[in-house]
Swiss-Prot record:
Its EC number is 4.3.2.1. InterPro entries: Arg_succ_lyase_C, Argininosuccinate_lyase, Fumarase/histidase_N, Fumarate_lyase_CS, Fumarate_lyase_fam, Fumarate_lyase_N, L-Aspartase-like. This is Argininosuccinate lyase. It comes from the Bacteria. It is found in: Cytoplasm. Belongs to the lyase 1 family. Argininosuccinate lyase subfamily. The keyword Lyase applies. Transmembrane segments: none annotated. It comes from Shigella boydii serotype 18 (strain CDC 3083-94 / BS512). It is an enzyme of class 4 (lyase). It catalyses: 2-(N(omega)-L-arginino)succinate = fumarate + L-arginine. One of its GO terms (cellular component) is cytosol. Keywords: Amino-acid biosynthesis, Arginine biosynthesis, Cytoplasm, Lyase.
């Protein structure tokens, strides 16, 4: 059924109807639409539009419909209703007759859909926060199990300084913690109810909107009706959080894809998250990680698309806003799926400690330690930097690590170098010296793990 029509003398062209209808995607708001309708029916009692008996009849019918939807959601898409609001109202009228036609009194689809979408966002943010914290916990557990796995850290994808696999895991814990914080902040701003704002100018019925907001689980009601029906900041905020979160997951995936290569060989992924080749029998491809990386682009696209949709809209509601849902639904679904998949990748990952350590000992990753040693002996850092660079060139020429150069050769570059340099150049020394807060020393990593465990509970 259409919720409009008296103004029109011709039926809508079928092509326009297909173009205009949104049920194929806003069916996902069915539960929220029904919950909002129950609350609205209670509000109508307070202003005398419905009796308590009528409201009870409507609420009972709506609750039955809610259970029907949960049991068989596909029934919605079997309808030719324009949108989810039309579908719910039509089903309600089927159940209670003319009484169902009283429910929309004082309400517009503009404030109705704004409310539905905010309720859906609140539910989905809760799911995202749970998945985010589960992935953080998986990373912390992986870190705890790999505190002694020394590996090279990289800048410019060149070996730079030794780190541990645990320290690498904890870097992503920090990123995910910021993602969690962004979601919590966004939740605060979207937790205001637009219901009761009507089409744009407010409702003509003296409904207590704060009470109505409380019935729906919102912290408060919105303050301006024009803004309320045209506000989609919460969509942009969640898309932005998703875009940033997916960048983090994409980087996580890229790191592990590299670590999993034959050239690096630092980790081996579980068979449960890899696939083979239809031609090459030996292949074990990191498809789960590649898909996480690949799906990042669609989320960025959803954010950009929504910004472009909203940028030129006058107040208040415009049909353009119907375009807010598909991108949002897809982006948050994608983010949620990728959070779950990233946790699954960590479940069963094998860190190849000998290969990690071998790589950490290559590439002159201890060169900075030699520079710091010279500084401790009174050599200015810039001069020490130059001296070590020359020593590295000589070590490369001889095909040796720095610690294998004899003392007399090292002293050619600086007379202050003594026998005490060799312990300094060990991998363990490289780690131990990074003992300031946030560093890679075993003590700092252990503290970071303990802090994360306490925060995550």
């Amino acid at each position: 059924m259409a919720l409009w029509g008296g103004r029109f003398t011709q039926a809508a062209d079928q092509r326009f109807k297909q173009f205009n209808d949104s049920l194929r995607f806003d069916y996902r708001l069915a539960e929220q639409d029904i919950v909002g309708s129950v609350a609205w029916s209670k509000a109508l009692v307070t202003v005398g539009v419905l009796t308590a008996e009528e409201q009870a009849q409507l609420e009972e019918a709506l609750n039955v419909l809610l259970e029907d939807v949960r049991a068989r959601p596909q029934q919605i898409l079997e309808s030719d209703a324009e949108d989810i609001h039309s579908w719910v109202e039509g089903k309600l009228i089927d159940k209670v007759g003319q009484l169902g036609k009283k429910l929309h009194t004082g309400r517009s689809r503009n404030d109705q859909v704004a409310t539905d979408l905010k309720l859906w966002c609140k539910d989905t943010v809760s799911e995202l926060l749970t998945a985010n914290r589960q992935l953080q916990s998986a990373l912390v557990e992986t870190a705890q199990n790999n505190q002694d796995a020394v590996m090279p850290g990289y800048t410019h994808l060149q070996r730079a300084q030794p780190v541990t696999f645990a320290h690498w895991c904890l870097a992503y814990v920090e990123m995910l913690a910021r993602d969690e914080s962004r979601l919590q902040d966004a939740l605060k701003r979207l937790d205001v109810s637009p219901l009761g704002c009507g089409a744009l100018a407010g409702t003509a019925y003296e409904i207590d909107r704060e009470q109505l907001a409380g019935w729906l689980g919102f912290a408060s009601a919105t303050r301006n009706s024009l803004d309320s029906v045209s506000d989609r900041d919460h969509v942009l905020e969640l898309l932005s959080a998703a875009a940033i979160g997916m960048v983090h997951l994409s980087r996580f995936a890229e790191d592990l894809i590299f670590f999993n290569t034959g050239e690096a060989g630092f980790v081996e992924l579980s068979d449960r998250v890899t696939s083979g080749s239809s031609l090459m029998p030996q292949k074990k491809n990191p498809d789960a990680l590649e898909l996480i990386r690949g799906k990042c682009g669609r989320v960025q696209g959803a954010l950009t698309g929504m910004m472009m949709t909203l940028k030129g809209l006058p107040l208040a509601y415009n049909k353009d806003m119907q375009e807010d849902k598909e991108g949002l639904f897809d982006a948050l679904d994608t983010w949620l799926d990728c959070l779950h998949m990233a946790a699954l990748v960590l479940d069963g990952i094998q860190v190849k400690r000998p290969r990690c350590q071998e790589a950490a000992q290559q590439g002159y990753a201890n060169a900075t330690e030699l520079a710091d040693y010279l500084v401790a002996k009174g050599v200015p850092f810039r001069e020490a930097h130059h001296i070590v660079g020359e020593a590295v060139v000589e070590a490369i020429r001889q095909g040796k690590p720095l610690e294998d150069l004899p003392l007399d050769e090292l002293q050619k570059f600086s007379h202050v170098i003594g026998e005490d340099v060799y312990p300094i150049l060990s991998l363990q020394s490289c780690l131990d010296k990074r003992a300031a807060k946030g560093g890679v020393s075993p003590q700092q990593v252990a503290q970071a793990i303990a802090f994360a465990q306490a925060r995550l509970g």
